[in-house]
Amino acid sequence: CIPCDDFMPPAPKDIDKKVGRDLSSLVDMTVDVTLAMEDKVLGELRAWKPDCIVSDSICIWGKLYAKKLNVPFVCSTTTFAFNQQTARLMKQSLSELLRMLSGMPRINARLRQLRRHGYEIRQFYELLQNDNDTETIVYTSKEFQPMSETFSDKFTFTGPSIAVPKPSGHKKSRPLIYISLGTVLNRQEDFYISCMKALKSEALDVIMSVGGRTDISGLGVIPDNFQVIPRVNQLEVLQEADVFLTHCGMNSVSESLYFGVPMVLFPQQPEEGAVARRVQEVGAGIPLPGREASVIRESILQVLKNARFRVAAGGIGAAYFSSKASICFS
């Protein structure tokens, strides 16, 4: 283990606003972290002389260090595998495209800085994309990976690694709806209020996880059929849920599919949008077209009452069982 916290550059104060939304900021962070840890980590690696370096696809500096030291590299990918073909799935708004174009001079300047330090990076997409010559572990099934036929046999699709808790044994008297926007961009009080307004009069129960930074007292009167809490054991809840309104993070979607729970899709970032589109393609959920209470209610009831969504989710979940990963029970 190489402790690196003391060598990490400070995180930008506005990181919540930029995470997943600003490509130039991602390149900035990558270059800053790579160069800040360079002497420490490269020194340790040269002393250890490892036979292989395994690094998360988001920890791009792992790939850069391996390439610089000419050490075999294995990429561990917790999202979809990403190449030039699947990049087309990352649909961007006009404002996002303009922001990317305006950031290109800054991105190119940072790439030149990397090259001055001996990292042979020509184009920014080399930092982000998986290539067909690199051994890559992908924690989803080949059935759920978009355009899986475009990836070489260097890619191993293991399925998600899920530690399944024992069922609670609780018997439900009516359907259970689970709502969560994840752990990052979850301070959305107006949306939570709309959810309560949408479902307070329906004959169902709702668990809504709002994150530790949301002031629950500021949401007003909590309906009797709602549990509004900062965080939950998501795997326990999904074992009993009938519909999941989700931000479409890869982990959340994988867990939902594993338990055969259909979804209402409310992505917050571009990569979550790609996950949402794939869920819709396989028939396991529908996009939420708006934030109004009436739209939320209609979307959730549509998924709840139409069995084909649960059947589709269960089909993808069954494919996880046939993948190479083992599922752990705790």
Features from the language model and the residues they span:
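C-terminal "capping" alpha-helix adjacent to the active site of nucleotide-linked donor transferases
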Residues: 282, 286, 291-308
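A short, well-ordered alpha-helix in the C-terminal region of glycosyltransferases
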Residues: 308-322
